[in-house]
Amino acid sequence: TPANVADFSATAYFFASYLRKVLNVPVGVICSSWGGSKIESWINKEVYTEKFPEISLSVLTKDPKDIARPKDEPTLLYNAMIHPIKQFTIKGTIWYQGESNLNNPQVYKRLFPAMVRSWRKEWNQGEFPFYYVQIAPYDYGRKNADKTEAAEIRQVQLECLKEIPNAGMVVTADIGNRTCVHPSDKESVGKRLALWALAKTYQRSGTPYSGPLYKSFTIDKEKIIVEFDYAEMGMTSYDREIVGFEIAGKDGIYYPAKAVLFDNKTKVTLTSDQVPEPVGVCLLY
C-alpha cells in the first residue's frame, strides 16, 4: 500500500508488481535484506563447517554488543533474517548483492553457489528458481584498490549462471549510475527479474527474458567474430556506434575495436588497425 511501500525494496516491489499485472493474481513478496552486506553473512553455519573450514566463525562466541558490523560477519544475517522465514512456502528467490564482496571475487565464486544450494536444502522444495542481478556500473575504486574488481565480480556472477541450476541473471550495464552506488532505475531491474520468472517459472512462451550473453569467439584472419546466447532475434545498437569492445594480439595489449553486427544481427565482428593478428577480446573489462 502507499502507506508501507516506501520502506520496502523498490526492486522487489517492481518485480512483484509486474508479475501481478501480467499474471492477474496477487503476488506476495518477503523482503529480507540489509544494504551493504557481504554474502558471508547470509550463509548458515553448516556450510562453513562442511565446505569452508578456513573461514573463522569466532563471531558466534562474541557478545552481540561487541559486534560492530553484523552485516559483514559469517552466519549472522542468515540466523536473523533467513532461518526465521523457512516456515513459508516460496515460489523462488531474487537476489541483488555483490558490491561488498569486491575484494575477493574468487571466494565469492565459491560462496555464492554454496549459499544457493544450502537455501534450497533448507526449504526442501527442490531446485526452486533463483534469479539474481549482476552488480551495476559504479566507480567502485577505493584507495589502493584494484580497479578491475567490479569487472571481476561481474565475470564471476556470469560464470555462476552455469554453476547454479535453474538460475537467471539480470544485466544492469545500461541502467547504472557511475557516481551513485544506488542507481535510481529500480523499475527496470525489477521488470527484468520478472521477465525471467514469467518465462522460466510461469512458462509464458514468447517472453524475451535475457539480453545477449557472451558464448564464444572465433578468429578469421584479421577479424574476431563473437557469438552470443539469447541473440536469436537479433541485436541492435539503435543506430549508434558500438563501443566497449577491445581486441589484442600476441603482445597482450588491448586496443578499441570497431564492432559491426552481421548474420541477421546475431553476431559481432571486431577489427582494429592496430591489431592485424588478433588473439583475444574483451568487453567493458
Task: For the regions a language model picked out, list residue spans one by one.
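Cell-envelope and extracellular/periplasmic
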Residues: T1-Y285
